[in-house]
Amino acid sequence: MLQLTEKFKGTTTVGIVCSDGVVLAADRRASLGNIVYAKNVTKIHKIDEHLAIAGAGDVGDILNLVRLLRAEAKLYYAQSGKRMSVKALATLLANMLNGARMLPYLAWFLVGGFDEKPRLYSVDMMGGITEDKYVAAGSGMEFAYSVLDSEYREDLKVREGIKIAVEAINSAIKRDVFSGDGIMVVTITEEGYRELSNSRLKAILRQ
């Protein structure tokens, strides 16, 4: 019997910096203990046209922070007339998480975006922050890293990064019981945020 204290979980997420943008990818499964609770969970969240975060961990905690970050980004733009930078968003998130460390949010985040260039940060539940060229988080991260470590190059184009990100998530899905039920892929370039449709994703993977 499930206990009410068990948490709804999100699992494997991946981020890749390419020469022309950032790719974020995630599986769509959420589990409650050992039970698959949902099969179409959104784990990548648009903050504005050039910023997004991907979360692995407690779904409620992630969505709460997404709402706060969207509000802060809008307020920053209203007050300054400028978009928040990727680093500023990641630092804000890190400060929120560090401030709650006595009763922590149960989530690990990837913050990706494009300001002067594509950038990617990982932020852990204690507020530790690192800028990365590629990163994986969640229960299937070790399987995703086996792909990222062997396939990543700094001169990757977004189209190539999409294929590697999908391969990394698929590796996790095949081996991690808490990952599965499809893949969501988002790109963030100078032109802005774009979520790939299933048909578009399939077309890219066939090339």
Curated annotation (Swiss-Prot):
CDD domains recorded: proteasome_beta_archeal
Main location as per UniProt: cytoplasm
Family annotation (InterPro entries): Ntn_hydrolases_N (IPR029055), Pept_T1A_Psome_bsu_arc (IPR019983), Pept_T1A_subB (IPR000243), Proteasome_bsu_CS (IPR016050), Proteasome_sua/b (IPR001353), Proteasome_suB-type (IPR023333)
PROSITE patterns linked: PROTEASOME_BETA_1, PROTEASOME_BETA_2
Keyword Hydrolase: yes
Cellular compartments per GO CC: cytoplasm; proteasome core complex, beta-subunit complex
Record-listed E.C. numbers: 3.4.25.1
Propeptide residue range(s): 1-10
A Gene Ontology BP annotation from the UniProt entry: proteasomal protein catabolic process
Inhibition and activation profile: The formation of the proteasomal ATPase PAN-20S proteasome complex, via the docking of the C-termini of PAN into the intersubunit pockets in the alpha-rings, triggers opening of the gate for substrate entry. Interconversion between the open-gate and close-gate conformations leads to a dynamic regulation of the 20S proteasome proteolysis activity.
Highest taxon listed in the record's lineage: Archaea
Entry GO MF terms: threonine-type endopeptidase activity
Catalysed reactions, semicolon-separated: Cleavage of peptide bonds with very broad specificity
Active site (record annotation): T11 (nucleophile)
Localisation: Cytoplasm
Keyword terms: Autocatalytic cleavage, Cytoplasm, Hydrolase, Protease, Proteasome, Threonine protease, Zymogen
This protein's record includes keyword RNA-binding: no
Function summary: Component of the proteasome core, a large protease complex with broad specificity involved in protein degradation.
Subunit structure: The 20S proteasome core is composed of 14 alpha and 14 beta subunits that assemble into four stacked heptameric rings, resulting in a barrel-shaped structure. The two inner rings, each composed of seven catalytic beta subunits, are sandwiched by two outer rings, each composed of seven alpha subunits. The catalytic chamber with the active sites is on the inside of the barrel. Has a gated structure, the ends of the cylinder being occluded by the N-termini of the alpha-subunits. Is capped at one or both ends by the proteasome regulatory ATPase, PAN.
Family: Belongs to the peptidase T1B family.
Name of the protein this chain belongs to: Proteasome subunit beta 2
